[in-house]
């Protein structure tokens, strides 16, 4: 039986390939749909209507309109770090 961490890794890989399809990368539209489905609260809370465009620009380092798994994982890592920072602050406030 896989551990929770192994399951999390599998979920990230599966999610990327579900939205990337056979081409093996995400286009801006793929990324937008992925963000809407997998992180609906994130996009809803963005004040900037160009949030997906800016994320795509940050992730598409080759400027070819494609986001590979490594760049996708960087996005997930960044979001996780931001959520952890919020969680730590919230837990400290709760402990007071």
UniProtKB/Swiss-Prot annotation:
SUPFAM superfamilies (UniProt xref): EF-hand
Organism domain of life: Eukaryota
PTM annotation (N6-acetyllysine): residues: 23, 28, 37, 54, 57
Keyword Ubl conjugation (UniProt): yes
Region (Ancestral calcium site) location: 60-71
Glycyl lysine isopeptide (Lys-Gly) (interchain with G-Cter in SUMO2) crosslink, residue number(s): 37
Function (record text): Because S100A10 induces the dimerization of ANXA2/p36, it may function as a regulator of protein phosphorylation in that the ANXA2 monomer is the preferred target (in vitro) of tyrosine-specific kinase.
Subunit details: Heterotetramer containing 2 light chains of S100A10/p11 and 2 heavy chains of ANXA2/p36. Interacts with SCN10A. Interacts with TASOR.
Name used for this protein in its record: Protein S100-A10
Organism of derivation: Sus scrofa
């Amino acid at each position: 039986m896989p551990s929770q961490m192994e399951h999390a890794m599998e979920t990230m890989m599966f999610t990327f390939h579900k939205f990337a399809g056979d081409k093996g990368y995400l286009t801006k539209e793929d990324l937008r749909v992925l963000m809407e489905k997998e992180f609906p609260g994130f996009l809803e809370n963005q004040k900037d209507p160009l949030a997906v465009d800016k994320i795509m620009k940050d992730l598409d380092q080759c400027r070819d309109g494609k986001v590979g798994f490594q760049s996708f994982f960087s996005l997930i890592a960044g979001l996780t770090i931001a959520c952890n920072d919020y969680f730590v602050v919230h837990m400290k406030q709760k402990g007071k």
